[in-house]
Amino acid sequence: MSTHPFPRPLWTLNIAAWLLLAAWVAQIAPAQSDVAELRLTVKDAAGGNLPAAVELVNEAAHTRQRVQLPPDGSYAFRNLPFGFYRLAVSQPGFATASALLELRSAVPVAREVTLGIQPLESTIEVTDAGTLLDLNQTANARYIGAQQVKERRAGQPGRGVIDLVTMEPGWTLEANGVLHPRESEYDTQFVLNGFPVYDNRSPAFAPAVEAENVESMRAYTSGIPAEFGEKLGGVIEINTRRNTSPGFHGTAVAQGGSFSTASGFFSGEYTQGATSASISAEGFLTDRYLDPPVTENYTNHASSSAFTAALDRDWTQFDRISLSVDRRETHLEVPNDLLQQAAGQRQDRNSSDTAGRISYQRILSPSLIGSVRVMVRDTSAGLWSNPLSTPISAAQNRDYREGYFNGSFAGHHGRHEWKTGVEARYASTDEQFGYLIGAYKLLGVRVIDSGYPPVYAFAGHALDREQAGYVQDMIRLGNFTVSGGLRFDHYSLLVNQSGWSPRAAASWHSQSLGIVLHGSYDRTFGTPPFENLLMSASPATSALNGGFYLPLKPSRGNYIEGGFGKAFGGHVRLDASYFRRDVRNFEDDDLLLNTGISFPIAYHSATVRGVEAKLEVPRWGRFSGYLSYSNTIGIAQFPITGGLFLDDGAQALLASTDRFPISQDQRNTARGWVRYQILPRLWTAWSASYNSGLPVEGADQLPDISFLAAEYGSNIVSRVNFDRGRVRPTFSLAASAGIELWRHENRSVTLQADITNLTNRVNLINFAGLLSGTAMAPPRGASIRLRAEF
């Protein structure tokens, strides 16, 4: 009989009721923004308002914004990354004014510009070179700007954000779009417009935030402020809010390409006075969504849709409220290997995410701001298998419902930029999972331990209660910048633990030499992933393989980093760093065959160390580009906790104390990208990536080559170096070209064409072992993207 997903629980989250409660809370509590805000007013020499054109540029943060001011000559630039900005103000008939500004406070900065006989501060034109290097940075933050997002090369649907991040040093990609910041697993935190999301956001786990809806991003792996906790392998801040001129503005995108892929996106925003409202919708169809185990790409169709609505309102010059709701869902097939396809296997998966968010901000004084944020969210996933699934037919339904609260104060006092706050999460998780073993052997080779029962079912429910508080401060002392913070976390989901996390960072700069030296220390308290956690930590699951019950506990880590940033000639920047991480209860995952479903596990400990470097030319005449490289070594130590190990001999791992390379231990990673503006409306870009290869876990326990070739094909097996126990290196080259077909003022139509994997190389990402499935990267592909902005 077919194995169907279990019914969803009768109780469901009432988003509307939670939003009403959130609105009531927001009216009585203060809030604050994590980024800078510039409130600009432009006047003429007689004091009259001017509707001038304004440009803000920060090369270090890849930020370049242009706005036409309204008739009153006033505008608030929001969501600006901290750093140095070139401000240019122009109006026909007036002298252009320019200045270099530093924005380093969450408290809004007011600036008045006078055009006329006496322009702002100086008649000397300020260039972008002054914004190339952030002289007060205490760690390497990687910024991705609006132009990079718009002109990104085409990739697999649902991976636009992920592909942009993996071009940065320190970030690698495993099968099915799983991000690994500095070889960490299950340890990436996404922060969407100030709201943290801790679950796995790879395409195999949850619907993605597609890049078309993103204005800018920041990714960092060190010098992490105390306000961030739980998932600290890497933090990715995503900003979807745009600074636009008053009136209605919209974007429409249509894209089509290889593998029967088609996608569409539309967004519209209306700004009038103190109110801004926006909506967006997107969707895609494709026949290549996950990374298949064979070149034939069997059963890999997927479809996705998403809708978002947001409202921002400045009630007064001191009070602002923001609301948003979004709904995303994805339906996909699980790719088969050769044996599964021959058997007639069909497995379907689905995932959905619904969220409502509200935030309120109040300026309490010229140097103090407060904020509150409230979020409610429901995320779910399911798996269905037909009776021909082999060697196992599995079914799953899991659901996670959370309510999140964050309240904070931030202020500026002399040399200090400080912030303090609290946050809490009240959530529940439900898991239902079952399997039916159809074959313990395939082609005479044992693939599942004979000790496992042929049928197993699990159902669990648990409450998740988490609270945290923090304080942090940044002090500037001449050429020195020092930041420090302290965070306390309490975690209660199956286990009850708490931890203190001190954070410290410092930098020294020389403006004349164009150099910044920096170092940081981060203590981390990392909570286990909630996806399939109840089953992984269940005594009944441990008993399946003769093991014993060891609950998954929060990880505790010590991160150190030292590095520098150097500017050359006002056009070139070099960033380099060395890091080391020591972690107890190191998180990883146990993949269930090729289903994309994984179960959290933890090793006793792990150490990861490495070097990273990036040479970048943000803009030099017609050229821009970068070259990045990272070298890392990650070693973990048994025993292991959690997981669902069906492999023969897996029981030995529960008592072993051996050391081994962790599953995402890719030693060498290099990325390159170059862009050339051929004509004012025509450009081309080329990118390349190199990966030295991931380990093959349990390589000495794999079946003989003939069986592996029958399961995956000889062309896949040939991409494995069994002597080294690693996948062979991969290389991919891509080319893009774009043309602006039409432009009038702020309206434009552009066309972009991309070709990926130009050499059509067979690139293997993972190969089947104890802890990972088999997955290959896409072959050569092409796509065309048409974009209209109005």
Predicted regions and their residues:
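C-terminal beta-signal and adjacent terminal beta-strands/loops
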Residues: 4, 681, 689-711, 728-732, ...
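Periplasm-facing N-terminal accessory domains of Gram-negative outer-membrane beta-barrel systems
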Residues: 27-142, 196-198
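Periplasmic N-terminal accessory/gating domains of Gram-negative outer-membrane beta-barrel systems
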Residues: 94-95, 99-112, 120-226, 230, ...
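Transmembrane beta-barrel wall of Gram-negative outer-membrane proteins
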Residues: 256-285, 295-332, 348-370, 502
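Face-selective signature of the C-terminal outer-membrane beta-barrel domain
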Residues: 312-330, 351-496, 622, 626
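Surface-exposed extracellular loop regions of Gram-negative outer-membrane beta-barrel proteins
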Residues: 331, 338, 380, 433-435, ...
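Membrane-embedded beta-barrel scaffold of Gram-negative outer-membrane proteins
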Residues: 371-375, 381, 509, 551-609, ...
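Gram-negative outer-membrane beta-barrel transporters
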Residues: 476-481, 578-582, 601-700
